Amino acid sequence: MQDANAAFAQYPSLKDRTVIVTGGATGIGESIVTHFARQGSRVAFLDIQDGPAEELIIALASKGCPRPLYFHCDLTDLATLQAIFKQALDALGSIDVLVNNAANDQRHSVEEVTPAFFDTSIATNLRPQFFAIQAVIPAMRSAGRGSIINMSSISWMIPSIGVPLYVAAKAAIVGLTRTLAHELGPHNIRVNAVLPGAIVTERQRRLWYTPEYKAEIMASQALKRDILPDDVARLVLFLAADDSSAITNQSYIIDGGWV
């Protein structure tokens, strides 16, 4: 179990840094937004879940954190995504950190995938990451720095059945991360990937985290405890902070020792 009284890192370099998080209203994204706000960062986040987004903003404001900006955005609509990123960049005035977190792991078999479902899955789990990066590059290049953190998954590294398109997209994100790290490195823009394992979010608890699935996870992990959204968020903070200024082109697994 985690120590409830543990003290975690505060990163001075993240104070007043500007951050955009996709899929920031719930789950891992909510924890990422919360952790950046606690660091004193200026955060904007995108999501399609207005209710949870507003609840998060109110909760953070009540704790004295900088009030994050929320933008309703369907990431599968590319024109809307590009327009919202322009609005977010205009509102923040600059961009130091991009966290490409949004995804959808809807279960699907090979047989039931239609061309339309294929396109929607890629338009949710891969295409937005590329075009979000494209949107922030000019501002990061002008600033002479930036940290881009792409959320992949260990799903492509283990026997994952029932989510072939999700797995394919998550594998592609690692390739995208590696090539862009080299392309953007000369501009002091770092690009890294985070590969979570079985993270116990509220959605996972509601849909799939049965006693049988938990037993499978615990049999696979070296650490015999739930891996939580906060665990992922703390890794993201490190990769965003100046403490990791020499780190790029890396893929960090956070799965309790499953892989």
Q: In which residue ranges do the predicted regions lie?
A:
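C-terminal substrate-recognition "lid" of short-chain dehydrogenase/reductases
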Residues: 130, 145, 226-254
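Short, small/polar-rich loop/turn modules that mediate ligand/substrate recognition or access, typified
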Residues: 99, 185, 190, 247-249
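Substrate-binding pocket helix/loop in short-chain dehydrogenase/reductase
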Residues: 109-110, 114-122, 217
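Active-site helix of classical SDR
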Residues: 133, 169, 177
